[in-house]
Amino acid sequence: MTSPLHATGGGAHPHAALTGTYLDGAHLDEGVANLRPDYRALLIVAIGVRGGPSDAASDEALTRAEALAKARLNGAPPESLPEIAAWRDAFLGFAVKPRQARSSLEALLRRVDAGLPRIDRLTDLYNAISIEHLIPLGGENLDRYVGPPRLVRAHGDETFETVADGIPT
């Protein structure tokens, strides 16, 4: 994993130090890298982005993404797309059966016909980007993040919190 670029236009970006605190310790575990040497991670820190409930702009982005996905699929299942087939192959490398754990992209594509849920502005936007570019994409609230981001191979006994409507489940 490479370090983020902290400069633009020849001068230091005003948020470079803050961005560095989030990304400098980012780590892709050797166990993941060995299973998928072709895997690349891209981490982006967005500072000053306003969250909040879904709005007209995020709804429009998802509506465009839904239309694009329907046109690409043309009635075929998501796994017919080469990008989805590649992610299924990656999951098999992690000893995960594709029907038991799908990439977030495949899960979104499977929901397109019924309409994608509108969750909140940021989630709606990264879901739209995921569909438009056919890449699994996610987001985290870095104000609540503990430690640097890391991607490790799960053992299966990990605990994690899930949240629905802002309430831990």
Segments predicted by a language model, with ranges:
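Charge-biased, low-complexity intrinsically disordered regions
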Residues: 2-169
